[in-house]
Structures are given as structure tokens and as C-alpha cells.
Amino acid sequence: MITTGKVWKFGDDISTDEITPGRYNLTKDPKELAKIAFIEVRPDFARNVRPGDVVVAGKNFGIGSSRESAALALKALGIAGVIAESFGRIFYRNAINIGIPLLLGKTEGLKDGDLVTVNWETGEVRKGDEILMFEPLEDFLLEIVREGGILEYIRRRGDLCIR
């Protein structure tokens, strides 16, 4: 799983309410959710993001309520994955469950607008000639993401046995 795209950089403590604000969150349709992603903190985001782009953040990305809509909106926009220093636990699970890869680590070396090539399985991020390393998901969680999420994983494998 290697992707190339532009970095969209956010700070610390980005809540699910900032990703998909509750007052706009009146649908479960991913295409509609995509239109409201970050609408209050970065109004240009949904219009300008391209498939393969990467969300990068500081600490506690996706904290707050258990809105699956936050992860669904990012996936519907074609976000390749999220790199952050830490994640809200519910967002972390929601992202994996719908097939969004995540990397953990210090993100100060990545700036808004950087063009990066990300290997989501090894944690290697290439920015020009520079290589940054992040912590990838553990193997079992990577398998779920590779399959496109937990439902596809179950459909294809028939169980949730950890090997």
C-alpha cells in the first residue's frame, strides 16, 4: 500500500466534531459527509483535496464523540490515510474498521502542501530526498485495512481469529 499525495496539515486536538460538525451531520451518505469535512476549520478542504492526499496532525486526532461519519467523510474524499502523533481511540478503530491506514509518530517534519509518498505498511514517508519513519499499524490491523475494512475482512475470511 504505497500512495503519493499532498499533505493537509492540522494541529493538536482535532475532534470528530471539527472533522464532521454535528450541525451539518444530518446524513449517513459518505458523498454528502465528504462535502462537510473540516468545513468550519478549513472551508477549502473538501473542494481542494484530491484522492491520495494525506491528513497529517499532531496529538489526539479524532478525539471526542464516536462519530463514524468523521472517518467516512475522509474515506469518501479519497484520503489515502492519516499520520498523527496520537489518535482518539474511537476514531482510530473507526478508521481501521472502514479501511483507512494510519501511521503514528512525530509530524513536525511534514508541512502543509508537501508532496509525499507513503508506504502505509512500513511507515516510510518520502518527501523529496528526505525519508521520515513512522510506526505502522500492527499486522492484524493492516490486514483489515488491506481488505478494505472489517466487514470485507469478515466476508473474505469468514472469522475474526487472530493468528
From Swiss-Prot:
- UniProt xrefs under InterPro entries: Aconitase/3IPM_dehydase_swvl (IPR015928), AconitaseA/IPMdHydase_ssu_swvl (IPR000573), IPMI_Swivel (IPR033940), LeuD (IPR050075), LeuD_type2/HacB/DmdB (IPR011827)
Report the top EC class in one word.
lyase
Pathways per UniProt: Amino-acid biosynthesis; L-leucine biosynthesis; L-leucine from 3-methyl-2-oxobutanoate: step 2/4
CDD domains (alphabetical): IPMI_Swivel (cd01577)
Q: What reactions does this protein catalyze?
A: (2R,3S)-3-isopropylmalate = (2S)-2-isopropylmalate
Q: What is its EC number?
A: 4.2.1.33
A Gene Ontology annotation in the biological process aspect, one of them, is: L-leucine biosynthetic process
Quaternary state and interactors: Heterodimer of LeuC and LeuD.
Q: What does this protein do?
A: Catalyzes the isomerization between 2-isopropylmalate and 3-isopropylmalate, via the formation of 2-isopropylmaleate.
Tell me its family. Answer: Belongs to the LeuD family. LeuD type 2 subfamily.
| Name listed for the protein in its UniProt record | 3-isopropylmalate dehydratase small subunit
State the organism of origin. Answer: Pyrococcus horikoshii (strain ATCC 700860 / DSM 12428 / JCM 9974 / NBRC 100139 / OT-3)
Q: Which gene encodes it?
A: leuD
